[in-house]
Amino acid sequence: MLGWIVGTEWFPYAVKVTDDANRSLAPYSGKYFRATAEATPFESWLASMLEVLAKKELEYAWQHPVALSNWPTTDPLSHPDEANEQEDLVSVDPMHVEPTSAWKAGYFASYHIYPAYPDFMRYEEKYQDYRTVEGKSDPYAGYLNELRAHHEGIPLMTTEYGTSSARGMAHRGFLGRNQGMHTEAEQGRINAELLDDIYDEGLDGGILFSWQDEWFKFAWNTGDLEVPANRRPMWLNRLTNEQNYGVITEPGESIEETIHLDGKTDDWDERTGSRSGFGGLVERLSDRLLGRVPEVRQRRYEDFDLSVSHDEAYLYLFLQKREGEWDFPDEEINVGFGTLPGGSTKADKAPGLTFPGGIQFLLQIRGEKGSHLWINSAYDPHTWLYGEQLGHMPDPVIEKDPRAGVFLPWRLALNRPLELPQSGRKIPFEDYEVGRMNFGITDPSDPEFDSLADWYAEGGVLEVRIPWTMLGYTDPSTLRVWDYPYEAGKIEAVRNEDLRVYPAVQSAGNGQISVEPLTYAWKGWDQPTYHERKKKSYTILSEVFEDHDRVKTPLR
């Protein structure tokens, strides 16, 4: 037990309502803590809460250092170019609360500070103009510098800092310090840079967020696609940045059942029962009887075999040629996915192909730089919400008929349109293509490991993994997908018993092809399986921590 941090990231409107309703409240004065004459009613109430804590501690003959939780949204600084009213609406100032001489353990200021939010971190000129001691532009360091100056006389700690190794992203940050879409190695590098800033600006410590990934978290741009919300802990959404901040990852499945995209077949052999020998057969049958084996479905096509499997985070595809090697871009692989009855039997992105039964998504593998996952326009929640409902997208393509065959880039929002109040600068709506499929190896022991990779091909082996949300699943543990948003008028989850997978290989002169599906179904689950692994960021940070084992005197 090192100390107490009291409170949470204060909701600014709750602070304002409290202050407005209690303007006649006198500053609190207790035996161990008091509010200063400048304290707001909310700050005075916080002083009284520290008093409650202090008295409780002393019942056990203890005193520990204490702080009030805070974050940039309710900091005591001024941010005149912050576009979102609530991000600079009120202040909660730790300097307006102080310990009395009876409290010996100390009092410090605590802030959760991330580099990509609020927007003033990215657009406020005073932070953009700030230079570190090395002469580099660094808004995060600029903010820390101003915060340190305000809290003169008391210790100041960044009690949350970090970045996410999610496959998805929620916000862009300066210097590429985005909320998500970082490899594990990039996560380690950025976290090391943030710690350097905390150290160089003379703060008294930093606590990394977080130790491990947290499946239960949600983010503003994916939360509506996770239904029901109370089942988030059952599966890992790799598109939700908030779930992937840890330096310890918890991939779905046991370590023995993990599928790596690496061009090798041993992991798939383990799942499909292709282990050699009588012993392997007996072990496999035993595993199946005990329910320890993930589902796998297989189907033979003209020139290749398809296997499909899954875990708590991904759907996996394994396509193996019976002769020869995959040849991109001379060959093109298109895989349609039918998550609901109906959909389009044609796709404008894949002329010449027919998908009986209809599809909502189309995976297109053309090579390392030209591969995408497309979404049926009528099924696209992004264009429905930000194009039709809110009008944020310029000239959105809106085709409400799921049979029309219009497929769009799979996109996620990053920010709504902004107008900066001081400069008058207008910032347009921001989004990005999450459906751009990344080529790479996902085996952590491989020197070429890429934690953001979606597919890999080597020789006659092609492997793909797709996060569940990118295939329309709101909860794979109960086989729920979202319904057509234009028809439902909202994001509504419906149950679908199976997934139709339509693989096709096209090359010059193929002509018309009608693709028969592999139908994939699986049992739902109420107990997720996972294992723990140290991310690459863990090793990077463990080395950096050795250089920051003491408080540094500010360089300025």
What are these regions (language model features)?
Residues M1-P12, P41-Q63, L89-S101, E193-E201:
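An active-site-proximal structural segment forming one wall of the substrate-binding cleft
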Residues M1-T40, A61-P72, D204:
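Active-site groove signature of glycoside hydrolases
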Residues W4, L53, A109, E160, ...:
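Conserved, mostly hydrophobic/aromatic
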Residues V17-S44, Y123-G135, M169-H182:
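A solvent-exposed, charged loop/short amphipathic helix patch at secondary-structure junctions
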Residues G173-G176, E186, D197-S274, V282, ...:
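Aromatic-rich peripheral "rim/lid" segments of glycoside hydrolase catalytic domains that contact
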Residues G263, A313-R322, G460-W468:
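Short, well-ordered beta-strand segments enriched in hydrophobic/aromatic residues
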Residues S274-G279, D287, E295-L420, T478, ...:
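Surface-exposed, glycine/proline- and aromatic-rich loop segments on solvent-exposed faces
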